[in-house]
Amino acid sequence: MNSLEAGRVLSVLDEALEGIRLISYVTQDVLDTAEQLRDMLGEDLANALIKHRQLIQSAKSTLNNDQVQASTLELVRLLKKSPSAQRLQVLPYERTYGILQTLQYFEQLRQFAQKRLTTTVEEDSSNREFFEEVRDREERAVAEQEQLKQKLKLQRVELQKAAGTIQVSEDRARGEVSEVQSSTQQSRAAIEGSARAQSEADKSSFQSDLDQVTKELAAARAELARLRQEHKDNEALLRKARKRAEQDVEVQIGEYDADVGAKEEELGKARAEYEEVLRQLQEYNSGWSEMYQERLEYEERERRLADQRFQAALLAVRQNHAARVIQSYWRGFKKAREAAKKKAKKLEKAKAAKKK
């Protein structure tokens, strides 16, 4: 066979190999989704896939493969001709193991044919000598394998004897395990009975504790409602006191404005007293804000059952402290107002004396 004929044979094999490679991408998943791949593969190729799928389904019931073979050849022809056939390679479908094996065998066949067609007489003779040498090696290897098999049989007999000894030990161990399991079951039954009795006792104790805690919770809620109402009343009183204090401050400011023509020293003293009153008012406002914030924090902490009594006592202490602060401030404020009235009377007497 000359090189031209060899090239033709290889060309035919390459064409067949390309057809097998293209048809390997036509998996069952591709056939099932042929309608969805119409835009990707084109109308003709999608219709061919749908027709091929229908023929395969009908061939399962009729056992007629002629139409399937003809459809396969037509599908291979379209795959070779269509430029969109390469897009099948990017689909997330795996090819079957059988088609991959066929493709591999056909590639090996093509390589073997190419090697045979391009091999000279000398190379063929050399290959035959190499084949004879390999065959001799294989025969020697087979003989060695038979010897090893005989040795393996002897070893198996020895292992079977050892296995019999091991089986006796295993039976003895199983008997001991059975005794341990029996004693374990008895211990388990005793432990379960004890645990069940302890569980009943714990349930009874828990119910008693739950009733006690429920009563304490109801009492704490009633105390919280009372404290809230008391705090609300105190807050109303504080607002009234603040309003009265503001009115008194306005009166004092008017009196100070009327005495602008007085001496500079008296004016400075009046301003100092006025600033002191404002500072006390700011302290009062700050104390009121702190009391309000503490009340919010108290209500939040009251939701915790473990701190109910402690929080109620703490709030009572804070309210008593606030009342003492307010009373102290009010006594100081009354003293300041009485002092201001006395000073105003002195100023009036001084003015009357000057007029005389």
From Swiss-Prot:
Keywords: Cell projection, Cilium, Coiled coil, Cytoplasm, Cytoskeleton, Flagellum
Annotated spans, Disordered: 173-209
Domain IQ: start-end pairs: 319-348
One Gene Ontology cellular component: axoneme
Principal location listed in the UniProt entry: cytoplasm
Record localization: Cytoplasm, Cytoskeleton, Flagellum axoneme
Recorded coiled-coil stretches: 126-167, 197-287
Compositionally biased intervals (Low complexity): 178-187
Oligomer and partners: Component of the nexin-dynein regulatory complex (N-DRC).
The family this protein is said to belong to: Belongs to the DRC10 family.
Function: Component of the nexin-dynein regulatory complex (N-DRC), a key regulator of ciliary/flagellar motility which maintains the alignment and integrity of the distal axoneme and regulates microtubule sliding in motile axonemes.
Protein name: Dynein regulatory complex protein 10
Taxonomic path: Eukaryota, Viridiplantae, Chlorophyta, core chlorophytes, Chlorophyceae
